[in-house]
Amino acid sequence: MIFFENGFAQPKNSYIAVNTLIARPLAMGGAFLAVDDDLAASLYNPANLGGGSKTRAFSFQLFLNPLTPGLALARREDFYNHSTSASAQAFATLGLLIKGLTLRAGPFEVGAILAEQTTNEIAIAASDLFEVNDYLDNQYSVLALRMRLAERVALGGSLGLYYQSLARKQREWQLRASYGITIAPWPNVLLGVSYLTMPVTPNGGYRNHPERFVNGSVNIGMSFRPYPGTIIAADIRNLVEDENKNEMVREPHFGIEQNLFSVLALRGGAFWKSEDERLAYTLGFGLIDSAKLLLGNPRGALPNWLLNYGAVVEKDNAGQRRWIHALTVGIRI
């Protein structure tokens, strides 16, 4: 769930209610190319799918978002085209509960992200809290594969199916591939490089804001764990771009996360907005690490925060302050 709030006398608000993965990266300034995570990591660097776990034991995990099917039932006109049959709507609604899965076998890890709503600011304009703006016309699914080459080196690639609507109740789709590599020179340091491609529209890129990616860009990142439960991360966006035409240029991103007893994770960060030539600041938190508190921290399991909140505090071109709020709900089983 993402909220766009403008600083005018009558604030404009926009909302995403069905995004599952954005809140944690957003709260950390978007510096996520080398941060351990399950599904969200593969959107920034497919070589980091599943994080830095050293176990090669077989595992299978499902990721659920119970909010999504509830909204689909309550707001069918926003989720589905009028031509969609009732049976197709029922099947799709049930499928919206499952937002992703991961499968690990030896040195290989496969991840799938299912029907994740785009965060493009233009595509998600909405006027009330639970408006979803033609969700199925503006969402994407990603299949990612990670292969661990050695103890501290991994390669990854992903193929994304992206839907976008340039007119109401009309959509087109495109396939895009991305690649990445991670290297851990020391046990508490991880380096990552990714090459990301995504659709481009007349109004901008698919993940241009607040995620700050452009099509055909090379991005680099580093994370450092000075103490257990502490992550310090830094990225440079768009270091090299295939299509450097009036798009964003190189931008530094910084983030930090502090885990407090697996009950609360505090996050903060900042990034440089090249088009406005000013900093944007981020903050957020995670509540209840179910992997440790509810499941006893099974071997190789990454934290799974049941509720994540993230916000960007920025100023627009007119100098007005704006908040971008993100709230996500996710259950891993």
Outline where the language-model segments fall.
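Subset of outer-membrane beta-barrel
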Residues: 8-333
